[in-house]
């Protein structure tokens, strides 16, 4: 997906470039991640999809078309991704973190849903009443994006773009100490040099530190966390741990 809707060939060029830069950084640091892919991207970028799988990362569903979400995407994207990858798709994230039917996700056999940013961002995310950390809805594990305790400051991609890295890393460390884990997400287009393309008409907070700057920031974040001894894992690996914890019988 891209920040603003673009013709398919332009969007694919940006997304493929950015995905490869992310993969380079992960490979350099020896860590695994989860790639939430639209079926549209998977069908049009087979070489990148193969690289994602060959390098040991998880593929999860992200709908079909990022700009035209449909209720049927929950089933269609899973079916398409499983056909293309030969893997069971366990996770789902709705494009733009919009609401999605947990009942339908559970019916389709998903293990987890990561479509919630429990932050308070007027006009975007208004989720102060939602849990900050993992919880269950039926048999489906909910994995919200991490926000800080108390004020729920979001630590997603936009914060990493614009906060001083010392401050961003300090907030990440605070969440890790408080919650025991940290969940964040980025987009491939953030790793494309958006500042070199005024025709995209991106606002400053979006293009700030894009391209090489985001490569350096992601690398810095990973190295900082590894130096502190924190392990990295895919969402499916994390889900198995949390499900075991949440489903553990109460001790009498």
Predicted regions and their residues:
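Short, small-residue-biased leader/transition segments that mark boundaries at the very start
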Residues: 1-3
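Short catalytic helix/loop segments, enriched in acidic residues and glycine
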Residues: 5-24
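The substrate-binding groove and active-site-proximal loops of carbohydrate-active enzymes
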Residues: 7-13, 37-38, 61-68, 89-90, ...
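Aromatic/hydrophobic pocket-lining residues that form the small-molecule binding cavity
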Residues: 15, 19, 45, 70, ...
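C-terminal domain-boundary segment and adjacent tail
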Residues: 18, 27-30, 165-252
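Metal-dependent polysaccharide deacetylase catalytic core of the NodB/CE4 family, i.e.
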Residues: 23, 27-101, 107-116, 122, ...
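Alpha-helical scaffold elements lining the catalytic groove of polysaccharide deacetylases
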Residues: 65-84, 131-180
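Soluble, non-transmembrane catalytic domains of enzymes that act on hydrophobic metabolites at membranes
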Residues: 106, 124-137
């Amino acid at each position: 997906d891209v920040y603003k809707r673009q013709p398919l060939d332009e969007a694919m060029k940006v997304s493929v470039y950015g995905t490869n830069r992310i993969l380079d950084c992960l490979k350099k640091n020896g860590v695994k991640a989860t790639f939430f892919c639209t079926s549209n991207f998977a069908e049009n970028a087979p070489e990148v999809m193969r690289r994602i799988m060959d390098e040991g990362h998880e593929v999860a569903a992200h709908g079909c078309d990022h700009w035209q979400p449909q209720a049927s995407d929950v089933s269609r994207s899973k079916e398409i991704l499983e056909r293309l990858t030969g893997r069971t798709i366990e996770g789902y994230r709705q494009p733009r973190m919009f609401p999605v039917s947990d009942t339908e996700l559970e019916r389709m056999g998903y293990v987890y849903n990561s479509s919630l940013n429990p932050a308070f961002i007027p006009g975007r995310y208004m989720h102060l009443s939602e849990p900050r950390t993992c919880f269950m809805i039926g048999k489906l594990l909910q994995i919200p994006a991490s926000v800080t305790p108390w004020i729920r400051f979001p630590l997603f991609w936009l914060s990493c773009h614009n906060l001083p890295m010392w401050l961003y890393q300090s907030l990440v460390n605070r969440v890790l100490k408080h919650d025991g884990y940290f969940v964040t997400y980025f987009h491939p287009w953030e790793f494309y040099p958006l500042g070199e393309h005024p025709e995209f008409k991106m606002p400053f907070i979006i293009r700030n530190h894009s391209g090489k700057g985001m490569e350096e920031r992601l690398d810095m974040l990973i190295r900082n966390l590894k130096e502190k001894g924190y392990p990295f894992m895919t969402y499916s690996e994390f889900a198995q741990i949390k499900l075991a914890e949440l489903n553990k019988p109460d001790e009498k």
